[in-house]
Amino acid sequence: MKKLTFEIRSPAHQQNAIHAVQQILPDPTKPIVVTIQERNRSLDQNRKLWACLGDVSRQVNWHGRWLDAESWKCVFTAALKQQDVVPNLAGHGFVVIGQSTSRMRVSEFAELLELIQAFGTERGVKWSDEARLALECKARFGDAA
């Protein structure tokens, strides 16, 4: 069976999803999984994330080190998800057990952007036009921005 995905935005979309499920013939030897979840982060949210991370990486020295945007992403996602660390295989460092931002729901991603904004603002980050616009849209339109 091919994978079906429905974005339910109206009663008509909802009925289409219900109809698709009703067409499935149950087979106890080959169960089908139906998952209902909030949609994952959008490409627009991802663009906003990297604009903000770039600003933080250029302006914030973290414990005597300048981190790149990718490293900051790890720091922020670890803080948001209260993640854990484990020793690396060589035993000379640590690895953060994390969550991929591409798997985050829209609301989780919005929380991540809020965390970055609060952190950067506390440290006097001057937001670039792209990041500032992204943060203003988030403030104005909420998670849909």
From Swiss-Prot:
UniProt xrefs under InterPro entries: NinB_sf, Recombinase_NinB
Lineage: superkingdom: Viruses
Disulfides per UniProt: none
Transmembrane portions of the chain: none
SUPFAM superfamilies linked to this entry: NinB
Family: Belongs to the ninB family.
Name recorded for this polypeptide: Protein ninB
Gene that encodes the chain: ninB
